[in-house]
């Protein structure tokens, strides 16, 4: 049932994208693509690749000034036969009185699909504000049927970034809390720097992440430093 629901929502998002794209003129549609490699695919403090490297990539489309949608994929390793994660997402973003807002839906699908409880959907809402070189924001993600369970979950996050005087170099970090209805809640945080190489599509992000999960049985939640090299076209 989770797979059918997630697939249906992904299809609805795709139809909405096509409808919006059809209503817009060609110059209102922008398409970008990205591909990258990371030393460890980390999501909310947990390694999704069993602390091994991952290859990732996606395509994004923006229609007009507000509607966006895209698809993104990465290899994963949960110690079973699951090999890939595919995210399909869409939403609307805009600006009001100096605040940037973003509301959307993200569908997480896992292949080859033997573990259908992995698939889930999240509703997203985020607000941020830029003051000079500093941008601060808050975001919330709610899933009625979270990863690996049949229960709801909520993730809340405070984040900030700083565009340094060095051209192309920014520093960013976030503190979040994952509330789970099937197990203990946990906190996670990260801090890192991103450098965009001038005249190229390349950027390099180096980041430290950790959680307050203290269990030898869950080594994928330990503190770690990982690096991601990405090209955006």
Task: Give, region by region, the residue ranges found by the protein language model.
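Short glycine/proline- and aromatic-enriched beta-strand/turn motifs that initiate or cap beta-hairpins
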Residues: 26-77
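Transmembrane beta-strands of outer-membrane beta-barrel pores
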Residues: 37-43, 73-77, 94-96, 107-111, ...
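Outer-membrane beta-barrel "beta-signal"
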Residues: 191, 195-197, 219-233
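Cleavable N-terminal export/targeting peptides
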Residues: 1-30
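Repeated loop/turn-to-beta-strand initiation elements of outer-membrane beta-barrel proteins
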Residues: 31, 65-71, 98-103, 132-138, ...
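Outer-membrane beta-barrel architecture
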Residues: 58-60, 89-91, 124-128, 157-161, ...
């Amino acid at each position: 049932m989770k797979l059918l629901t997630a697939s249906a929502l992904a299809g609805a998002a795709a139809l909405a994208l096509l409808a919006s794209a059809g209503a817009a003129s060609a110059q209102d549609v922008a398409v970008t693509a990205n591909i990258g490699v990371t030393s460890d695919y980390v999501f909310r403090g947990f390694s999704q690749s069993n602390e091994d490297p991952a290859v990732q990539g996606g395509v994004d489309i923006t229609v007009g000034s507000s509607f966006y949608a895209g698809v993104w994929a990465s290899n994963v390793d949960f110690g079973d036969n699951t090999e890939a994660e595919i995210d399909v997402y869409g939403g609307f973003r805009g600006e009001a009185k100096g605040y940037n807002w973003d509301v959307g839906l993200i569908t997480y699908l896992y292949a080859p699909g033997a573990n259908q409880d992995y698939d889930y959907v999240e509703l997203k809402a985020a607000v941020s504000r830029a003051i000079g070189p500093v941008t601060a924001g808050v975001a919330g993600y709610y899933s009625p049927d979270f990863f690996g369970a049949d229960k709801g979950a909520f993730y809340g996050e405070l984040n900030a970034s700083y565009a340094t005087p060095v051209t192309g170099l920014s520093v960013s970090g976030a503190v979040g809390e994952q509330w789970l209805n099937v197990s203990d809640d946990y906190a996670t945080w990260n801090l890192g720097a991103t450098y965009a190489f001038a005249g190229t599509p390349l950027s390099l992000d180096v980041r430290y992440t950790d959680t307050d999960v203290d269990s030898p049985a869950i080594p994928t939640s330990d503190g770690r430093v990982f690096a991601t090299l990405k090209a955006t076209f």
